[in-house]
Amino acid sequence: MLEELLNGNIEKKTITQIYGPPGVGKTNICILSMLKAIENGKNVVYIDTEGSLSIERIKQLSEQDSDELLKSIIIYEPSSFEEQSEALEKIFFLENIGLIVIDGIVSLYRLELCDNINENTKLNRMLGKQISNLLKVARMKNSGILITNQVKDSINGIEPAGGRLLEYWSKSIIKLEKTESIRKLTLEKHRHAKEGENLRFRIVQNGLEIINKSYQ
């Protein structure tokens, strides 16, 4: 799916970010990207911070033997932002990693934000350290990075959560929207592909059905 929009695979050693509201299909796209990496003979790290990953959905979307497939997926389910940091550090010791997925990169971060300035400063430093480690391990392993992000209200409608830090370090940013049963991916930032291109699709039982690709 993302290959259609990016005119190629997810770029290695950099961050590709997909953002959109809950229930719009971000996890489905992550699963398909994960399956693509496994087809290429690689293992995938999947950090699921929101409990969105379904083994049954992986089996539905895959054409491979599910037992063999699951051997190629390393899943972490952190329950705190500190545990998310620990999960990232474990990746340094793994082998043959083709893709690192963090589904909900700032979900736990936002849950722990409070009125205490010192605590929030600590969280911001931790987020910066996570991004640093993520890029470091991806460069070491020659891996792609795919993160999903929540949205927040802004003057222009909605924008990705996480502030300028995630915006700066994400070399590809893709907006995901939903209108009734139709979803739309729009490429907002990319170093090589054409910004503004969009892809409309439907979520079906065995995958995603592309309707059309256009530019606006």
Curated annotation (Swiss-Prot):
InterPro entries assigned to the protein according to its UniProt record, in alphabetical order: AAA+_ATPase (IPR003593), DNA_recomb/repair_Rad51_C (IPR013632), DNA_repair_and_recomb_RadB (IPR011939), P-loop_NTPase (IPR027417), RecA_ATP-bd (IPR020588)
Keyword Signal set for record: no
Keyword 4Fe-4S: no
GO MF term list: ATP binding; ATP hydrolysis activity; ATP-dependent DNA damage sensor activity; damaged DNA binding
Sorted UniProt keywords: ATP-binding, DNA damage, DNA recombination, DNA-binding, Nucleotide-binding
TM regions (residue ranges): none
HAMAP family referenced in this protein's UniProt entry, alphabetically: RadB
Annotated protein name in UniProt: DNA repair and recombination protein RadB
Species assigned in the record: Methanococcus maripaludis (strain C5 / ATCC BAA-1333)
